[in-house]
Amino acid sequence: MTSFASLGITEPILTALTDYGYAEPTVIQEKAIPAGIAGRDVLGSAQTGTGKTCAFGVPILQRLAQGGRGRTIRALILTPTRELAIQIDENLHAYGKNLPLTEAVIFGGVGQAPQVDQLKRGVDILTATPCLLYT
């Protein structure tokens, strides 16, 4: 049985995953996380509820935490719906709660001023719907 620690995940993220209730990685996580941490491209497919957000999110968080900080967007995640964008942002926030990274989510149908202000302050990870990102 594989553990999250055996996948090369750093302690701050391991602690957050444990706090979030994750005990052991799913198949998609076991295959994608080490490849993502190593900087390789990953194309994965898995059923709903198998932890795909963790599978791609943990490597993003770990690689960004190991690099320097800046005021520019360092990772961009595009999603087709606002609900999925919010869910991904909430999960990344939970997984990265012990890291000095910031994340934001932007989508249409709400006032843009708070979203623009957040981007001006600097964001490491941006999750967005394509339509609003374009505007």
Where are these regions (language model features)?
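Amphipathic alpha-helical segments that mediate coupling or scaffolding at interfaces
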Residues: 7, 16, 20, 35-36, ...
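Conserved phosphate-coupling serine/threonine residues in phosphotransfer and NTP-handling enzymes
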Residues: 26, 48-50, 81, 129
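Hydrophobic alpha-helical transmembrane segments of integral membrane proteins
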Residues: 30, 55-56, 76
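Walker A/P-loop
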Residues: 41-56
